[in-house]
């Protein structure tokens, strides 16, 4: 249990550091994965699908590296997983249709120039403090905390 708490603390700290020399953006949580890009994606999606009884689902993936290759360009692995919970998102979109531009939620599995694999996603606080208000929706700190706990579990299942 203590190692999970420590790992999460380190992940949040790492979110504040630039993993490839670029400035890290606030609200992003980046965790190292001990697996390949493909396996990390599979494990992340399996962890989301395991919560389907609670409404969670994986919608699709977007492989940026494959798109680059089709256009004669090279890009290290960069796959975005679109996922969400219509039970939570739909009522918010009913109140503010423009929220649909920012949801479903996304997670990025990527490989840096040294071959290290990372999982990056938005924090609950970022979603509640910036995304929701941008669409005229109230912030909900309790929802942000619950979302962070949910994603902590999913991310650990994908990366450990």
Describe the function of each predicted region:
Residues 18-20:
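N-terminal signal peptide c-region/cleavage motif recognized by signal peptidases
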Residues 125-160:
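C-terminal partner/receptor-binding element of secreted or periplasmic proteins
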């Amino acid at each position: 249990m203590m190692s999970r708490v420590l790992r999460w603390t380190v992940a949040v700290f790492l979110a504040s550091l630039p993993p490839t020399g670029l400035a890290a953006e606030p609200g992003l949580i980046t965790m190292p994965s001990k697996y390949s890009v493909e396996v990390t994606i599979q494990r992340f999606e399996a962890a989301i699908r395991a919560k389907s009884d609670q409404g969670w689902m994986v919608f699709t993936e977007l492989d940026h590296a494959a798109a680059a290759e089709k256009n004669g360009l090279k890009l290290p692995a960069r796959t975005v997983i679109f996922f969400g919970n219509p039970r939570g998102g739909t009522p918010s979109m009913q109140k503010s249709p423009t929220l649909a531009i920012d949801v479903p939620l996304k997670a990025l599995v990527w490989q840096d120039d040294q071959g290290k694999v990372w999982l990056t996603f938005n924090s609950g606080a970022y979603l509640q403090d910036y995304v929701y208000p941008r669409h005229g929706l109230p912030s909900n700190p309790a929802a942000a905390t619950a979302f962070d706990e949910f994603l902590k579990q999913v991310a650990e299942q994908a990366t450990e």
